[in-house]
Amino acid sequence: MTQLPPAIFLMGPTAAGKTDLAIELTKVLPCELISVDSALVYRGMDIGTAKPSRELLAQFPHRLIDILDPAESYSAADFRTDALAAMADITARGKIPLLVGGTMLYYKALLEGLADMPAADPQVRAELEEEAARLGWQALHDQLAAVDPESAARIHPNDPQRLTRALEVYRVSGLTMTAHRQRQLAQSTEAGASGRSQLPYTVANLAIAPANRQVLHQRIAQRFTQMLEQGFIDEVVALRSRSDLHAGLPSIRAVGYRQVWDHLDGKLTSAEMQERGIIATRQLAKRQFTWLRSWADLQWLDSLDCDNLPRALKYLGTISILS
């Protein structure tokens, strides 16, 4: 049987030190980096996403950073398409794709594929846009909530692109997006039980985080404070100056940006904004840990250890990812 090419996943919660370890790995391995982060795809959103500096990116390029305008949406399906293309290009040049980031849904989409959603239907889309113009997007959101409350809970009424797509899927197929995803989950579970994967690579799964959760909480608070000192509020002011950006867009709903936006709207004091931003980031980290606890064949590394690079290399050698 032909051996599949290698790939490395470097996962972990926010503020755990993933980027630093990824760069150390690229210094000693023939790897190229692919970002797995739903916020880093956006241009002009640098401080609040803790995006690597321009100097660092020039020295250690990351695919899938700064590829979209904040007015655009980016789905797990979009990521899967882009990441597979990047992985194929890296592999074709004899290198190893090293995927680093904390958007766990993206990793899952790569490994398991995505629900087979119906193609876009221009006529249905035109009907939905006409209804929105006549009734308002809130009315369409109410329609979605009536048939697919799970999707409605995830999609903001001011996110017309995702709202239109969810209703389009239901009207075209007769099944909600939630039903499609549940069917895909059942297929993925069956594939996992039989050892099949939708990703044509031999994947080494690494995760890094402080063993002490309080240490991570301290890091999160320190980083959010540092972002504010670096000009995070001014960054959001610049985004707000654009007439095509609003609080319902996926980019602006990113952790931190949402809280600063509300502060600039007068909904939160400066202290409340900072507190809620830190809490939201901690909640994100908790969700990331929840994903990781169920991840198979995962090698954990402690962020505070000084020997993570040799430990990671030893693990990669043990599973023959480097042979």
From Swiss-Prot:
GO terms for molecular function: ATP binding; tRNA dimethylallyltransferase activity. ATP binds at G12, P13, T14, A15, A16, G17, K18, T19. Its EC number is 2.5.1.75. The keyword Nucleotidyltransferase does not apply. Residues 37-40, 161-165 are annotated as: Interaction with substrate tRNA. InterPro entries: Dimethylallyltransferase, IPT, P-loop_NTPase. Substrate binds at T14, A15, A16, G17, K18, T19. This is tRNA dimethylallyltransferase. Its cofactor is Mg(2+). Catalyzes the transfer of a dimethylallyl group onto the adenine at position 37 in tRNAs that read codons beginning with uridine, leading to the formation of N6-(dimethylallyl)adenosine (i(6)A). SUPFAM superfamilies: P-loop containing nucleoside triphosphate hydrolases. The lineage of its organism: Bacteria, Pseudomonadati, Pseudomonadota, Gammaproteobacteria, Pseudomonadales. It comes from the Bacteria. The record marks T103, R125 as: Interaction with substrate tRNA. Monomer. It catalyses: adenosine(37) in tRNA + dimethylallyl diphosphate = N(6)-dimethylallyladenosine(37) in tRNA + diphosphate. It comes from Pseudomonas fluorescens (strain ATCC BAA-477 / NRRL B-23932 / Pf-5). Pfam families: IPPT. Signal peptide: none annotated. Keywords: ATP-binding, Magnesium, Nucleotide-binding, Transferase, tRNA processing.
